[in-house]
Curated annotation (Swiss-Prot):
Gene3D superfamilies: Mur ligase, C-terminal domain, Mur-like, catalytic domain, NAD(P)-binding Rossmann-like Domain. This is UDP-N-acetylmuramoylalanine--D-glutamate ligase. Residues 284-310 are annotated as: Disordered. Transmembrane segments: none annotated. Keywords: ATP-binding, Cell cycle, Cell division, Cell shape, Cell wall biogenesis/degradation, Cytoplasm, Ligase, Nucleotide-binding, Peptidoglycan synthesis.
């Protein structure tokens, strides 16, 4: 379970850094397999400390700043995804570990090594991986549903929770190993993966987020790119130029499928067709080709004569229960991933029609007197809010603001100009958003609370508009988390409805 280095003695001395959900999962996994443990956290009393005893995990816990002393006697380092490799006390520790030849793994590497070991006994599941700045959870949940509708036993795990190692442990204990793993992966998790190679993977988009953790956008994008192994079918968003740079790689044998909001022009690619006022999910097909799935027919290194391309209509976009063009492309990505592992199309299309979406992700709360109230509290970065505005494609009163995490808000200007009636600002970094939007000519007002902003938005919204909570910011300056922020928004909308004699 711990790789070739420990082949003859699969019980290395492990240092677990960080005791969040993934750190606890790695500690449980290592303890389960007989490893000796040292567990360290910068917090003297992390919340999961009591869970170590509750789970019967024996190990030496060390609280406080990290130091190289922690490496004494250690043969393997397990690092939690919440720890930035640029942290001042972590940089020398990791550098010393590598100088000493001590492997540094994250949870995803433990998972990859475990699958490799289980494979020696004949276990060969399909593995699908999903990453991107925005849309990961929706696409992951939808992909899992599609695989289930195709008759597969599916495990959905990773950044979406539960931790992949916990899900694997449960499957082993219940002798119910799945046919398909669908994993939502963050850039943090991918940063410390070395041998992970899924059968199919997607990068939905790359926009600025977590730049303080990675040190810059290029490093962030490079971490996202680690989702692809040499033989992974690459599903890429062709509307995102930074994503498409990953189509060109030294791994020239990699199979490639793209999706986007426009009509596809290459055999096997996916997109949207606008015809007589309707939008269709479509796939480009070579009229002269066989019925094999496109990824098995074409590799991106092959050169052939231009095919005669037709567009196969899969379903109308308005048959989806999830709102917005961005969710239509999420649906295309999920469909492409499921097809890439050889699943039949018909049950997948039924699954697309079923999926109702995830909470706080462009979720329609209510329609009151012709105005839609939409909760996108999970929109914690600029890219998410841009996607929500462009995806709804209607006149919007936007509520934004909070902890900006060091982002530049300039990319909001174009969609705000195109779609917004006015913008209501809340939170610590409202002045930065105002500065980025002042030249748009759109009315901008500041509000002390989300309740106040929501009522003000309701007062100016016209029938046919949407009042959209899509903050483009984290929530911790004012709330316990994005779910708490969403609850305050919903409660205020309920009060507005009640005041107009409507129940929701």
């Amino acid at each position: 379970m711990f790789g070739e280095k420990f082949r003859d003695r699969q019980k290395p001395m492990v240092l677990v850094l960080g005791l969040g959900e993934s750190g606890l999962a790695m500690a449980r996994w290592c303890a389960r397999h007989g490893c000796r443990l040292r567990i360290a956290d910068t917090r003297e009393v992390p919340p999961n400390l009591s869970a170590l005893e509750a789970h019967g995990i024996e190990g030496n816990f060390v609280g406080g700043p990290f130091s190289e002393v922690l490496l004494e006697g250690v043969e393997l380092v397990a690092i939690s995804p919440g720890l930035s490799p640029l942290a001042a006390d972590l940089v020398p520790l990791i550098a010393t570990a590598r100088e000493r030849g001590i492997p540094v793994w994250g949870e995803l590497e433990f998972f990859a090594q475990a699958l490799k070991t289980l494979g020696e006994s004949g276990y060969a599941p399909k593995v699908i991986a999903i990453t991107g700045t925005n849309g990961k959870t929706t696409t992951t949940s939808l992909t899992g549903l599609l695989c289930e509708r195709a008759g597969k036993k599916v495990a959905v795990a990773g950044n979406i929770s539960p931790a992949a190692l916990d899900k694997l442990t449960e499957a082993i204990d219940n002798t119910a190993l799945p046919d398909v793993w669908v994993l939502e992966l963050s850039s943090f998790q991918l940063e410390t993966a070395h041998t992970f190679e899924p059968d199919a993977a997607v990068i939905l988009n790359i926009t600025q987020d977590h730049l303080d953790w990675h040190g810059g956008l290029d490093a962030y994008a490079a971490a996202k790119g680690k989702i692809f192994g040499k033989n992974t079918v690459r599903v890429l968003n062709r509307d995102d130029a930074r994503v498409m740079t990953l189509a060109s790689s030294e791994q020239s044998g990699a199979q490639l499928v793209t999706f986007g909001v426009n009509e596809p022009v290459r055999d096997g690619d996916y997109g949207l067709l606008r015809d007589n006022g309707m939008i269709w999910l479509v796939q480009a097909q070579d009229r002269d080709a066989t019925d094999e799935p496109a990824p098995t027919r074409r590799r991106k290194s092959e050169s052939t004569a231009p095919p005669d391309i037709g567009l196969k209509r899969l379903m109308p976009a308005d048959a989806l229960r999830i709102r917005g063009l961005h969710n239509a492309t999420n649906a295309l990505a999920a469909f492409a991933l499921a097809r890439a592992i050889g699943l039949p199309g018909a049950p997948l299309l039924h699954g697309l029609r079923e999926y109702r979406g995830e909470p706080h992700r462009v979720e329609l709360i209510a329609s009151i007197e012709g105005v839609d109230y939409v909760d996108d509290s999970k929109g914690t970065n600029v890219g998410a809010t841009v996607a929500a505005l462009d995806g709804l494609a209607q006149r919007v009163v936007l509520i934004a603001g909070g902890d900006g995490k060091g982002q530049a808000f300039d990319p909001l200007a174009e969609p705000v100009t195109r779609w917004c009636r006015c913008v209501m600002l809340i939170g610590r970094d409202a002045p930065q958003i105002r500065a980025a939007l002042e030249h748009t000519g759109i009315a901008i007002t500041d509000h002390a609370t989300l309740e106040e902003a929501t009522r003000a938005a309701s007062a100016v919204a016209q029938p046919g508009d949407a009042v959209l909570l899509s903050p483009a910011c984290a929530s911790f300056d004012m709330f316990k988390g994005y779910a708490h922020r969403a609850a305050v928004f919903r409660s205020t909308v309920e009060d507005i409805a009640a005041g107009r004699g409507t129940m929701i």
